[in-house]
A protein has these predicted regions:
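N-terminal, positively charged/glycine-rich alpha-helical extensions of SAM-dependent methyltransferases
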Residues: 1-26
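Conserved hydrophobic residues forming the short capping helix/wall of the S-adenosyl-L-methionine
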Residues: 44, 101, 202
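Acceptor-substrate binding/catalytic loop of class I
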Residues: 160, 180-197
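Short, flexible, mixed-charge acidic loops at enzyme active sites
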Residues: 167-177
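Short alpha-helix
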Residues: 189-206, 212
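Core SAM-dependent methyltransferase catalytic element
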Residues: 223-241
Length: 241
């Protein structure tokens, strides 16, 4: 069995050359990155007891970035001292990520693979599932595979979209058709998942919830902030028991 959806992989492969163009098709992710990094550091610092203001605060931690794309999260995590493995089902994405890391003298272990194919049981302190679960083919298998790769007491961050009318209006109609922030067809609303449903799936896999936050975009300041509003974007932080 596989978690790969070939249509989804082809979709992102076609855009691979634009990963590091801050005004290109991945501009929304570039805008998203600061709040994602801030949140990961906040939760991880409390869990692993380190100081955020340390420029190498993630030193000694092994991180798996699933669906790493061109390396937008892998690179800052590496700069903060983590030992990062980035995997993606698109060979083109991995090629772009490797080239960009080399250009910036960053040592990142990039692999063209999927979590169910990695033979690395209990290997990682942190797993990053950022804007990935809404694109996989078999969510249950995907989450099971992630659980096996994470160390006991390790953290997993899952960022995705809630399955609500608001998310359909904002994330699909608004972002894809009206504002054209994303190419039409980037998201399939049927693959969005409610936070409580995701929590239940992870609870069944022996995870416990550490934190849940919404993420909302402020159009005036053109930035993302944490929010109590879970109706569209949210991040769920969980610990493997």
């Amino acid at each position: 069995m596989s978690t790969i959806n070939k249509d989804e992989i082809n979709k992102f492969t076609k855009m691979a050359d634009e990963w590091w163009d801050i005004n290109g098709k991945f501009k929304p992710l570039h805008m998203f990155n600061p709040i994602r990094i801030e949140y990961i550091l906040d939760i991880a610092s409390k869990h692993f007891n380190f100081k955020i203001n340390n420029p190498k605060s993630l030193n000694g931690l092994k991180i798996l970035d699933i669906g790493c794309g061109g390396g937008l999260i892998s690179e800052p995590m590496t700069r903060l001292g983590a030992e990062v493995t980035g995997i993606d089902a698109s060979a083109k994405n991995i090629e772009i990520a490797k080239l960009h890391a080399k250009k910036n003298n960053l040592k990142i272990n990039y692999l063209n693979s999927e979590p169910e194919k990695l033979n690395l049981k209990n290997e990682f302190d942190i797993i990053l599932n950022l804007e990935v679960v809404e694109h996989v083919e078999n969510l249950n298998l995907y989450l099971e595979s992630c659980q096996k790769l994470l160390k006991p007491k390790g953290l997993m961050f899952t960022a995705t979209l809630n399955k609500t009318l608001t998310s359909f209006i904002k994330a699909i109609i608004g972002a894809e058709y009206v504002l054209r922030w994303l190419p039409i067809g980037t998201h399939d609303w049927n693959k969005f998942i409610k936070p409580n449903e995701l929590e239940k799936k992870l609870l069944d896999l022996n995870f416990s919830t550490v934190n849940l936050t919404g993420l909302s975009f402020n159009p005036i300041f053109q930035e993302w902030k944490r929010s109590k509003d879970l109706s569209v974007n949210y991040i769920l932080a969980t610990e493997k028991n």
